[in-house]
Amino acid sequence: NRLDLVGPIVEQPEYNLFSRHKVESEFVPLYNTYGIGLTTWSPIASGVLTGKYSKGNIPAESRFALDNYKNLANRSLVDDTLRKVNGLKPIASELGVSMAQLGIAWCASNPNVSSVITGATKESQIVENMKALEVVPLLTPEVLEKIEAVVQSKPKRLESYR
């Protein structure tokens, strides 16, 4: 302000059920202190949260089938992650929503998230992703507790160093 500069108003971190630390721990002091919002990306963890992947089964039309995504697939499709994804399927089913919609809605339900960047390779995925906004009201505290019980990824809040 003293230099007549405009400060940042948004941060763009990765945010999904498996990548939460920055958004829910490191950046917490920024939201109210500086009024910073978040434009997050990778809400379905490169497609992992769609539930279409399983150990040794990568659909031919998926990004993980491409040579330049092999390393990401190897890092992402580990037993613990796939177990958690499978544990989320009954929750999505109970709500009558797709796994992608559940993942996107979960991100959008965070009050510090201003927008969620999604990706799609098909028109049908865009339509499905947009319907995630209708899912946000279904994410009651009880549903969020069920989700957390499966993924167990809530970060611990950083202690102040002052």
Regions found by a protein language model. Name each.
Residues 1-151:
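Beta/alpha (TIM)-barrel catalytic core signal, keyed to glycine-rich beta->alpha loops juxtaposed to Asp/Glu
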Residues 143, 159-162:
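Short coil/turn segments at secondary-structure boundaries
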Residues 153-157:
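Amphipathic, coiled-coil-like alpha-helical segments
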